[in-house]
Amino acid sequence: MNTQLFSPFTIQNVTLKNRIVMSPMCMYSSENEDGKVTNFHLIHYGTRAMGQVGLVMLEATAVAAEGRISNKDLGIWNDEHIEGLQKTVSFIKEHDSKAAIQLAHAGRKAELHTDPVAPSAIPFNDKMKVPVAMSKEQIQDTITAFQKAAIRSKQAGFDVIELHGAHGYLINEFLSPLSNKRTDEYGGTAENRYRFLREIIHAVKEVWEGPLFVRISADDYHPEGLTVNDYVQFAKWMKEQGVDLIDCSSGAVVPAHIDVYPGYQVKYAKHLKEHAQIATGAVGLITSGVQAEQILVNSEADLIFVGRELLRNPYFPRTAANELGFELKDPHQYSRAPGKIANTSK
């Protein structure tokens, strides 16, 4: 049976064997607090590649030591990180998957011993540190850090880079008027609030020729915050700059109550795909092959980002294929045990 979920998808010169993407999820497992890959990461990401995920995306990887969410985040702020990342990429590709990395800076959400930085001196909540408002020199240093991280990503062999512009981290903090109260060229109007991301994209594109994604929070869930309609303009600017796909998440720039339900963020991917004419990824409580297939058939998104379901089941692609009646090729090492996985949902 032909399916959309298991059809190839080509972005520039990179072809994914299917539309399933492992959503970037922080593992907080760099145990020596040096940002380096551990055996856990190799097994964690390698298993999903063996499970036949089309694009395995590594977690938020810090472009600066002070830009980590925690001391145990993965890092890419110096050349010593390349070797471990390279090994992980190599293992992913051995299993015919493509490898992506999410480049990130935590901004005011960094929970380290150092003082966090942000566009403005506004804490996320009353339990977190008041961040230091970034100087223009710090802004330029951070843009350079993203560029250097892109160079290292290329050296490590990644196929795709994603910029983390969501969930209340630094890029998102500049975009949202709730966290950006600057009065210079990096604050105020939508165009000014976009400037930080614009300059990061420009810097990355100078050294990176491959596919470039941006993850966004398409809704601030606040009456004075951003909505998906605001992101239509941002997405158009990103497309003009050569961004290939918008990964559509939501929330977490300020504390807010969010009603979640299966596929609750798909509407954002659909809206931006239609109104900004850019490829999108859907994410958020997508837990079955039938659900994922329907999103693609309805042209609501181009790729399906799967998070927690891949934590529960590293072989989710096989489960999804069984649901859809699609014959997924076994890894040759496992060919002595052909056939469908039992359907335990009944």
UniProtKB/Swiss-Prot annotation:
- Which residues make up the binding site for FMN? S23, P24, M25, C26, A60, Q102, R215, G307, R308
Per UniProt, subunit arrangement is:
Homotetramer.
Query: What is the documented function of this protein?
Result: Catalyzes the reduction of the double bond of an array of alpha,beta-unsaturated aldehydes and ketones. It also reduces the nitro group of nitroester and nitroaromatic compounds. It could have a role in detoxification processes.
EC number(s): the record gives 1.6.99.1
> Would the keyword Nucleotide-binding turn up in this protein's UniProt record?
no
This protein is called: NADPH dehydrogenase
Taxonomic source organism = Bacillus cytotoxicus (strain DSM 22905 / CIP 110041 / 391-98 / NVH 391-98)
User: Per its UniProt entry, which superkingdom is the organism in?
Assistant: Bacteria
The GO molecular function terms of this record are: FMN binding; NADP binding; NADPH dehydrogenase activity
Q: Which cofactor does it need?
A: FMN
Keywords, A to Z, come to: Detoxification, Flavoprotein, FMN, NADP, Oxidoreductase
InterPro entries membership: Aldolase_TIM (IPR013785), NADPH_DH_bac (IPR023663), OxRdtase_FMN_N (IPR001155), YqjM-like (IPR044152)
Q: Which gene encodes it?
A: namA
Q: Name one GO biological process term.
A: response to toxic substance
The UniProt catalytic activity note for this protein reads: A + NADPH + H(+) = AH2 + NADP(+)
